[in-house]
């Protein structure tokens, strides 16, 4: 990952609403969620959610796909894992540590 991409992704996650939305999408898995489902489940107004989803998509952390009349949003696991890899690549000076074990447990 390029440093500019990393900074954009971290900046997107630095907002409490975007972090909450992203974590909900990660937990949902590849099925993703519609904005309506997210707005109801997270108690976020639709217009607020729309703004934050746009920011997450711009950062590369979230993808969107049209399915019939609905937009489906999903966490971009490859991007997320690349970001985690960048943040932890020099962790513990290369020795096995709990961070590496946690990253390996993600089966996305």
Predicted features along the sequence, with ranges:
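Amphipathic alpha-helical dimerization/coiled-coil segments
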Residues: 1-5, 26-27, 77-108
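N-terminal helix-turn-helix DNA-binding core of bacterial DNA-binding proteins
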Residues: 4-48, 67-79
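A generic local structural motif
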Residues: 8, 58-59
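Alpha-helical residues within the helix-turn-helix
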Residues: 40, 57-58
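Short, hydrophobic-biased segments on the C-terminal half of alpha helices
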Residues: 53-54
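Conserved catalytic-core motifs of GNAT/GCN5-like acyltransferases
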Residues: 65-67, 97
């Amino acid at each position: 990952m390029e440093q500019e991409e990393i900074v954009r992704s971290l900046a997107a996650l630095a907002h409490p609403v975007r972090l909450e939305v992203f974590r909900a999408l990660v937990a949902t898995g590849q099925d993703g969620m519609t904005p309506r489902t997210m707005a109801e489940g997270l108690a976020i107004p639709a217009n607020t959610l729309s703004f934050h989803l746009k920011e997450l998509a711009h950062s590369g952390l979230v993808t969107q796909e049209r399915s019939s009349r609905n937009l489906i949003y999903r966490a971009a696991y490859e991007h997320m894992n690349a970001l985690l890899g960048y943040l932890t690549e020099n962790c513990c000076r290369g020795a096995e540590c709990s961070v590496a074990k946690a990253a390996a447990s993600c089966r996305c």
